């Protein structure tokens, strides 16, 4: 009897130890994901739920992690606050700080991916900037929200959960920087905000989404176009600032005043958000040609939400010395031109970059 009891106790002890080791192994096998927080509506708070207005960046990264405890089932999570601002205040200084820190984090062997929380107003610009300068093929996912954290039916928690699931998915590797909101995964190069307040505001209008994500379950569609990650030629490792590039919006009866003002105030490049296929008035066209001859790089894009700005189509880019943006909208054309100007002012070389990125 004593022998049977001893054997039974031994079996219980062995099973307990086995389960403990299995749990430890499962915990150790979880992807290690770091959240870099920058503020935005996802960290925003209302004065009351009856009011539409709110203050961005009211909660820090630890608050966001605590608000979605289910993420712990997906990954081993750590968090770091980079800034805590509304994304309308995002600027070159913060971009450089974020990008340099992101590259440091991704270079660590104990980090498998990164989720970045960000305001939605400029999330597409930040995502594309990072897509150009990140030196790793590990997953990087930007998430945000259209409703503040204190709102009824806030969308931030699910967006953060889905972003964590994407970053933890091994299939995310090599897809470049991604943006995930409202159950849709977008490539940084493609995504744009299309509505001022709807949760279904982000769309990839030219090529479509990169995939879908529903309660952490991911369906991938396509690998995004363009060079990125370890294949990118751009680097901000030694950059202290980015060249000034301004966007000029074309319209009926467009004058040259804003073109002149931008150049006078130090712009090294101009992106024309042109009508139709990147066009502008005759006087604006001639002034841009003169500006291009002076060494300021001119990129033609379109103010329309989708379509391509073709080279030498309506405008003779060879004659005027312009760059055609192709698929890139004005904000992303500005980002790529800033990076290009860190390397060269040669228009043909910059056109190559627009062709490839």
Regions found by a protein language model. Give the residues of each.
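Accessory alpha-helical/coil subdomains and C-terminal extensions
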Residues: 30-31, 36, 60, 64-71, ...
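ATP/NTP phosphate-donor binding region
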Residues: 26-105, 286, 330
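Bacterial N-terminal signal peptides
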Residues: 11-22
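Internal gly/pro-rich beta-alpha loop/helix module
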Residues: 143-214
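C-terminal non-catalytic interaction/assembly regions of soluble proteins
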Residues: 277-357
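Short Gly/Thr/Asp-enriched flexible loops that form oxyanion-binding sites at enzyme active sites
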Residues: 116-138, 280-289
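Short, acidic/small-residue loops that bind anionic groups at enzyme active sites
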Residues: 127-158, 164-168, 293-302
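Bacterial N-terminal signal peptides that target proteins for export
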Residues: 2-13
């Amino acid at each position: 009897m004593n022998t049977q009891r001893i054997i039974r106790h031994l079996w219980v002890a062995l099973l307990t130890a086995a389960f403990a080791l299995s749990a430890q192994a499962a915990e150790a096998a979880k992807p290690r994901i770091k959240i870099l927080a920058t503020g935005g509506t996802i960290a925003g708070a209302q004065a009351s739920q009856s009011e539409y207005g709110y203050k961005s960046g009211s909660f820090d990264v630890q608050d966001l992690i605590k608000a979605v405890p289910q993420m712990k089932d997906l990954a081993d999570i750590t968090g770091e606050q980079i800034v805590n601002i509304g994304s309308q205040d995002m600027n070159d200084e913060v971009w450089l700080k974020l990008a340099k820190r992101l590259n440091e984090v991704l270079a660590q062997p104990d980090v498998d991916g990164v989720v970045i929380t960000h305001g939605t107003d400029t999330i597409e610009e930040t995502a594309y900037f990072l897509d150009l300068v990140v030196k790793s093929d590990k997953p990087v996912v930007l998430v945000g929200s259209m409703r503040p954290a204190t709102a009824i039916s806030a969308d931030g928690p699910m967006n953060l959960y889905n972003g964590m699931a994407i970053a933890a998915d091994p299939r995310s590797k090599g897809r470049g920087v991604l943006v995930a909101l409202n159950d849709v995964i977008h490539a940084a190069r493609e995504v744009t905000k299309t509505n001022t307040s709807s949760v279904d505001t982000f769309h990839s209008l030219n090529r479509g989404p990169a995939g879908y994500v529903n309660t952490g379950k991911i369906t991938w569609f396509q690998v995004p176009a363009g060079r990125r990650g370890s294949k990118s030629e751009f680097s901000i490792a030694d950059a202290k600032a980015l060249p000034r590039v301004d966007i000029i919006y074309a319209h009926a009866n467009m004058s040259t005043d804003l073109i002149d003002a931008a150049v006078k105030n130090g712009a090294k490049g101009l992106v024309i958000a042109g009508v139709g296929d990147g066009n502008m008035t005759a006087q604006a066209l001639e002034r841009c040609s003169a500006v291009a001859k002076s060494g300021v790089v001119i990129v033609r894009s379109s103010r329309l939400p989708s379509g391509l700005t073709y080279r030498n189509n309506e405008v003779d880019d060879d004659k005027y010395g312009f760059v055609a943006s192709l698929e890139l909208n004005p904000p992303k054309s500005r980002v790529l031109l800033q990076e290009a100007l860190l390397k060269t002012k040669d228009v043909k070389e910059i056109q190559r970059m627009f062709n490839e990125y």
